């Protein structure tokens, strides 16, 4: 990936981030972890929590149904990590690879028209996204909210589970 970009100028244009603590986590497969190990020179694999068990539950009016229960003795099914810790590793890797980070907000396409290749990672609320897609996206308001919480515990073994309750999904990672 980044290792193969010799003799190419790469600019990462990003809005100056606000120092907000991010408790979110992400789960990746064994093959994705291998890709990261192969392509990130300063990857600290201690930030990844291997999981050998995945359980999915669905709640009906009268019962909770465990509709998926996968256990593996010899290999990890997925690896969970804190997004904030992984972001720090990626930013350090950008410095090592001499990728120029430009902190500014792009409000129109004229600012980026001189690049040979532009890859945009934008939310659906972006005005640039609207211009590129020509307002062809479909939006639906489900009139629902999501609540994310962080529970600090001292458990040594985490069994990853997801429950589909009548109130909505609950993931324990």
Model-derived features with residue positions:
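Glycine-rich FAD pyrophosphate-binding loop
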Residues: 2-24
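N-terminal FAD cofactor-binding segment of flavoenzymes
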Residues: 21-59, 147-150
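Conserved N-terminal helical subregion
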Residues: 34, 49-132, 138-147
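A short, flexible beta-alpha/helix-coil linker loop
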Residues: 15-19, 71-74, 153-154
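Glycine-rich nucleotide phosphate-binding loop and flanking beta-alpha elements
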Residues: 19, 108, 125-128, 155, ...
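Active-site substrate-recognition segment that forms the wall
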Residues: 161-173
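Glycine-rich, phosphate-binding/catalytic loops in enzymes
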Residues: 5, 27-29, 134-139
């Amino acid at each position: 990936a980044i290792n193969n970009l010799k003799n190419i100028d790469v600019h990462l244009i990003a809005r100056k981030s606000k120092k907000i603590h991010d408790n979110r986590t992400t789960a990746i497969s064994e093959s994705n972890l291998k890709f990261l190990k192969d392509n990130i020179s300063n990857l600290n694999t201690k930030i990844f929590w291997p999981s050998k068990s995945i359980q999915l539950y669905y709640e009906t009016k009268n019962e909770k149904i465990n509709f998926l229960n996968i256990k593996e003795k010899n290999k990890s099914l997925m690896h969970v990590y804190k997004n904030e810790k992984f972001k720090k590793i990626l930013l350090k890797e950008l410095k090592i690879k001499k990728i120029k980070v430009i902190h500014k907000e792009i409000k129109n396409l004229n600012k980026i028209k001189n690049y040979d290749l532009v890859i945009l990672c934008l939310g659906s609320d972006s005005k640039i996204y609207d211009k590129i897609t020509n307002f062809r996206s479909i939006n639906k308001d489900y009139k629902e909210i999501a609540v994310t919480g962080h529970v600090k515990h001292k458990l040594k073994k985490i069994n990853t589970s997801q429950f589909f309750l009548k109130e909505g999904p609950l993931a324990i990672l």
